[in-house]
Structure formats: structure tokens, C-alpha cells
From Swiss-Prot:
The keyword Metal-binding does not apply. It comes from the Bacteria. This is Phosphoribosylaminoimidazole-succinocarboxamide synthase. The gene is purC. Pathway: Purine metabolism; IMP biosynthesis via de novo pathway; 5-amino-1-(5-phospho-D-ribosyl)imidazole-4-carboxamide from 5-amino-1-(5-phospho-D-ribosyl)imidazole-4-carboxylate: step 1/2. It comes from Haemophilus influenzae (strain PittGG). Belongs to the SAICAR synthetase family. PANTHER family: PHOSPHORIBOSYLAMINOIMIDAZOLE-SUCCINOCARBOXAMIDE SYNTHASE. Keywords: ATP-binding, Ligase, Nucleotide-binding, Purine biosynthesis. HAMAP family: SAICAR_synth (MF_00137). InterPro entries: SAICAR_synt/ADE2_N (IPR028923), SAICAR_synth (IPR001636), SAICAR_synthetase_CS (IPR018236). One of its GO terms (biological process) is 'de novo' IMP biosynthetic process. The lineage of its organism: Bacteria, Pseudomonadati, Pseudomonadota, Gammaproteobacteria, Pasteurellales. GO terms for cellular component: cytoplasm.
Length: 290
């Protein structure tokens, strides 16, 4: 059964794959991370216990760590400033009061290693999103430098589509595209260097950006979590293999092997797969923040 978050006195204005948004006023909203899990763009019936709390802690850690690179969606307000105590107590570890921003209509993906849809593109064309890459790269090869590979932002339930940088410029304008690319690569580079010291390789990640009321580019949503990124362990990494990741890969692999057709409804995921997934999320938090 899909996890239901507590009913709050604030008005719900959006329900996404993982997060629900509530209106506070015209400048702020409350973002609440559920324990829902999506795989192949379908939301699973079975929640992953404590996932929303772990994701929120990882995101908050990175928002603070990367604040010197660019502004973020934090307002400085506590959930207790905007909700009655009995409601705030229920969601305090999975909720953030954030600025209302105008989201930029692309997925800002940065890749430092070759895998996933990028590997498929490379095998077919020698490029990713129109960017030429060296010959001879294999699964999990480290790229010569981090690359910005945007995709279109599709509605929930539709697959995002990789686009070229020129298409990105058409969608959001050349000036904004240049800012987004520069900031996304800077964020990834700093985070990846830090994570390596903690035994984690950040293979790739997706950033979400918005514009504030003054048109300032602002980092929003979630940052460098196992949901928005592929984390690999330094200990098990080897180019030419598909390294295990700190995320929903257990669930994805189980679903891939289950014969499921990737349409709702989703088959029931075994308890041991769910527990392994919780453990991996927790391990990522522990490694990054200790």
C-alpha cells in the first residue's frame, strides 16, 4: 500500500513521485518527502521505511555544504514556524520550508562516469547528448571531465528524453543555459571530490534549478541523494562492470528480473529487497555525514 503522509492544515498544491508540496504563502511552501519509491517512472505500492527522512537529511547536508557555490531554496524557517506543533512533530524530519521558485523546465544532469542511458547513447553514436566522447570507453569508465547532459522535463509517468545543449538553449534561452551548465558542473565537481574522501563515487546526478523573484538562479528540490544520483562504493568500483549502487538499484534489478512489463500495477516487492534498500540509503547518509 502506498504511503500516505499525515493530513496537514496547509493546502496541498502538488504531489510528485516522492515529494508533496503545501502552500504557506506567496513566497514560501512546505516540501515533505514521503517514503514512496518510483522505479521506471511508476510509483511502487510498497513504501521504503524512513526513506523520506534519510533523503531530507542528505539533501540538507548538501544544500549547506554547497551554499558557497550558489543560493538555495532554504528560507531559514522551521516547520514549527508554519505548522501547529502536533503536525510539525509528525513530519519534522522529512519536511523543509522552502522558497517558492519558478522551476527551470529541464533536468540538469551531470555525468562523471559512463553508465545507464549515457552508455547506450555512446555505444550507438560515440556521443552523449551530442557531446563527442573518446573511443574505447566501457561501462563505468571515468569520463575525461564531468559533462552536462540535459534532458527534457516530462510529466510524471513519462520518460525524460536526453537533449542536446543546443536544444537546451532553445528551451530556456542561451544565457540561462550557460548559467545552469556552469553551476551544475561546479556543484557536481565539488561534491564528487568530497564524496571520494568518504568512499563514495558520484557517478552522475540530476539537479533542479529555479529562478527567484529577482531572476536569480537557485538550487532547489533535492540535492545529491541516492534518488537523484548514482552513488558507487570506491571499494567495489571497477571499470567494465556495472558497480552496485547506494539506492533503489536492488528494487530496479528485482523488477527487471521479475518479468514485469513496466506498466502499473507493480508486482509486490519482497521484504528483504525493501530492507536492503533502506540499509543502502542509511549507509549513504552515514558515510557522507560522518
Amino acid at each position: 500500500m502506498t504511503q500516505q503522509l499525515p493530513i496537514l492544515s496547509l493546502k496541498k498544491i502538488y504531489s510528485g513521485k516522492v515529494r508533496d508540496l503545501y502552500e504557506i504563502d506567496d513566497k514560501r511552501m512546505l516540501m515533505v518527502a514521503s517514503d514512496r519509491l518510483s522505479a521506471f517512472d511508476v510509483i511502487l505500492d510498497d513504501p521504503i521505511p524512513r526513506k523520506g527522512e534519510i533523503l531530507t537529511q542528505i539533501s540538507n547536508f548538501w544544500f549547506n555544504k554547497l551554499a558557497h557555490i550558489m543560493p538555495n531554496h532554504f528560507t531559514g524557517d522551521s516547520v514549527y514556524d508554519v505548522l501547529p506543533k502536533e503536525e510539525a512533530d509528525l513530519i519534522r524530519d522529512r519536511a523543509v520550508v522552502c522558497k517558492r521558485l519558478n522551476p527551470i523546465k529541464i533536468e540538469s544532469i551531470v555525468r562523471g562516469y559512463l553508465t545507464g542511458s549515457g552508455l547506450k547513447d555512446y555505444k550507438q553514436t560515440g556521443t552523449i547528448c551530442g557531446l563527442k566522447l573518446p573511443e574505447g570507453l566501457v561501462e563505468a569508465s571515468k569520463l575525461p571531465e564531468a559533462i552536462f547532459t540535459p534532458s527534457s522535463k516530462e510529466e510524471v509517468g513519462n520518460h525524460d528524453i536526453n537533449i542536446s545543449y543546443a536544444e537546451c538553449e532553445k528551451l530556456i534561452g542561451a544565457d540561462l543555459a550557460a548559467q545552469v551548465k556552469e553551476k551544475a558542473i561546479a556543484l557536481y565537481t565539488v561534491a564528487a571530490e568530497y564524496a571520494l574522501t568518504k568512499g563514495i563515487i558520484i557517478c552522475d546526478t540530476k539537479f533542479e534549478f529555479g529562478l527567484d523573484e529577482n531572476g536569480t538562479l537557485t538550487l532547489m528540490d533535492e540535492v545529491l541523494t541516492p534518488d537523484s544520483s548514482r552513488f558507487w562504493s570506491v571499494d567495489t568500483y571497477q571499470a567494465g562492470t556495472n558497480p552496485p549502487s547506494f539506492d533503489k538499484q536492488f528494487v530496479r534489478d528485482w523488477l527487471e528480473n521479475s518479468g514485469w512489463n513496466k506498466q502499473a500495477p507493480v508486482p509486490k516487492v519482497p521484504e528483504n529487497i525493501i530492507q536492503k534498500t533502506v540499509d543502502k540509503y542509511q549507509e549513504a547518509l552515514d558515510l557522507l555525514t560522518k
